[in-house]
Amino acid sequence: MWGYLIGAAAAGVSAVGYQSMAPTGQWFGRAFTGLRRPSKLLALTYDDGPNDPHTLRLLEVLARHDVHATFFLIGRYVKRRPDIAREVVKAGHVVGNHTFNHPLLIFQRAPQVRTELRACQSALADAVGEHCNLFRPPFGGRRPAVFRIARQMGLEPIMWNVTGYDWNAPSAEHIERKVARQLRGGDVILLHDGGHRAFGADRSHTGTASDRLISRYKSEGFQFSTITEMMGAGASHPPTAVGGKAD
């Protein structure tokens, strides 16, 4: 009996731990992870910028393909390079809140979570002059209070369901292979244009992989959209974007 109870408790703890980090988990609050119905839309998202020079180089790749993406920016980097954040919005992309310091929020108290989100919101407002209403938790880590606080601040939680596992700067071939292995229409792709540990992380391979992935999937009839556009395709009341291509 005791063995059964201990095993059940351990399984419960394991499940809770998994759900706190799993990008598609919904136990701790609803988050957008892609379209549930068949679609030819794909959404590229980039975390941990702005980053010099790789965010700017990535903007060149996206412009060459006439593709718009969503960038979840770290507030302290926005403070350091507001000009790059402005270039992202100027190019027609959407920006979102990725906290100010990139902490793992499951270990932060509610006041700390609010401080992180507000500081990033302030940095984005100072840089681009508009209110941002998309939020992605660092590492995907969250608990119920995280999404509750975000929504109280008018932020919509955004996760992903496909990743290129590019945070350790693998080869472009590795990134492309990881994405292609998982990708289906309606998916949200997580990549990185910066690194949370330090400004200036090498993301050249992510830019190369993005170039190849866009070419490949455009040739197969897919279209790339911002998160806001994708949410609009699946709901009657999508969130208002900061940046994005004008109608």
Regions found by a protein language model. Give the residues of each.
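His/Asp/Glu-enriched short active-site or ligand-binding loop at hydrolase and phosphoryl-transfer sites
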Residues: 141, 147-182, 222-233
